Structures are given as C-alpha cells and as structure tokens.
Amino acid sequence: MVRTFHLCTITGIPLKAHLSFGLTLLFVAYVVHLHNLTVAASVGFVLLVLVMFVCVILHEFGHSMAARRYSIETLDIIISHIGGLARLQDVPEEPQKEIVVALAGPTVNVAIATIVGCYLHSVSYTHLTLPTKA
C-alpha cells in the first residue's frame, strides 16, 4: 500500500503502519494537552495506547500464523487508527481451514485476557481502596 510505512519484519512478515495511524498519535498528544495530565499520567496513557496496539498486532499475528499452518503467505500486517489488517495471499478453500484462520485472532485475544486476568487476580489492591470512616 502506498500510504504505509514499514516498521519492522517479524517472522518474515512485514509490519507496517498506515498513514492514518498518525491520527492515533495526534489523539494521544491532544488528550495529554487537553487534560493537563501529569508526567506520570501522560506516560501511563501512552503506555495504555501502546499496549492496546500490541494486542492488535498479536491478534493479527494469530491470523497470520494460522494461515501459515496451511501454507498461506501473509503479505503484511498493517496497523491503522482503527485497528489492524493481516493481508493474506489467499483464503483457505476448505471452510474448516478458513474458520481456523478466522478464529485464530480472537483466540489470541482470549489468551491475552486470560493471562492478564490471572495476573490481576494475583496482585493486591489494598493501595486502591477508598478511605472509610472510622
């Protein structure tokens, strides 16, 4: 695609950012400026957005790895302001294989949610409790 910038290549798959991804960066800068966030809050917000896009990229790699299992090449993965797209060379002809490729991305999301949920369940939140009247 003409409006993309190559970021890196992972497992032989080019990862690209669409020009519209710049809108996300502008949005982050706007929110930080608009709300006069502290440095800590600004860093936290930027990290939240980055983690979200890492999850999007992992989701797309889920589709790509499932397609690779059926010898279907992934041309590239493109991230934009609204999400990601794994561009596959072809679509599996057998419905069962197509379902596996289609469900691989959401399966990655479930795995991420499970890992994060287990971690959050294991940590203490006593420092986040509201003060109570004595």
Sequence positions of predicted segments:
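Short, hydrophobic transmembrane alpha-helix segments
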Residues: Y30-S42
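Membrane helix-loop-helix hairpins that form the core translocation module of multi-pass transporters
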Residues: V100-Y125
